[in-house]
Regions:
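Extracellular lectin-like interaction modules
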Residues: 1-167
Length: 167
C-alpha cells in the first residue's frame, strides 16, 4: 500500500528505504528533506501530491528501475539516481525543477508546471530527455558541461519546441 509521510518545520526530514518493494508515496507533506530509495523495477511513484519544503532525493537502486512522480510540490533541489537503459524518470513539479547532481540511466521527462528549470548540480541522462516548462519560464544550465545528455533532447517552451543535444 501507499505510505503517507508528514513532518513539520524545515528540520522535519524523512527517509524511506522500501527495500525491494514498490515505494508508493500517498499525499504527504515533509517540512524538510525527503529521501526515497527503492529496489523494485516499478520503483518509486506517488498516488497523491507529495509536498517537500526542502530537497528531494530519489534513488532506484535496481537495474532498469523507474522513478515516476507526477504530483510533486518540491521547493528545493531534486536529486535522482537510476541505472540501466530502462531506468527512466518522469517528474511533474508544481513549480520549477532544480536538478541537483543526478545520474539517470534511461530517459528523463521533466515538467515544471509554473516555474523555471535549472541544474545546480551535474545532470547526466543516458537516454532521451524531454523538458516541458510553463508559460513564462527560464531554462538555465549554469555550466554547459554539467548537463550531459547522450540521447535526443526535446524542450517544450510555451508551445515552442527546441530539439537538439545538450553537451
Amino acid at each position: 500500500g501507499a505510505v503517507t509521510l508528514n513532518t513539520t518545520g524545515a528540520t522535519g526530514h524523512a527517509e524511506v528505504d522500501g527495500g525491494t518493494t514498490i515505494l508508493d508515496i500517498a499525499a504527504s507533506t515533509v517540512g524538510g528533506n525527503l529521501s526515497l530509495t527503492s529496489g523494485h523495477a516499478t520503483g518509486i511513484t506517488d498516488s497523491g501530491t507529495v509536498t517537500v519544503g526542502g530537497n528531494l532525493i530519489a534513488t532506484n537502486d535496481v537495474s532498469n528501475g523507474d522513478i515516476n512522480m507526477g504530483s510533486l510540490a518540491v521547493d528545493g533541489t531534486i536529486a535522482l539516481e537510476t541505472s540501466g537503459s530502462g531506468g527512466d524518470v518522469t517528474l511533474v513539479n508544481d513549480v520549477g525543477l532544480d536538478f541537483a547532481t543526478s545520474n539517470i540511466g534511461g530517459d528523463l521527462t521533466g515538467t515544471a508546471t509554473t516555474g523555471n528549470i535549472s541544474d545546480s548540480g551535474t545532470l547526466t541522462v543516458t537516454g532521451a530527455t524531454e523538458i516541458t516548462l510553463g508559460t513564462t519560464p527560464t531554462l538555465t544550465v549554469t555550466d554547459v558541461t554539467s548537463a550531459s545528455v547522450d540521447g535526443d533532447t526535446l524542450i517544450i517552451l510555451d508551445n515552442s519546441v527546441f530539439t537538439g543535444g545538450i553537451t
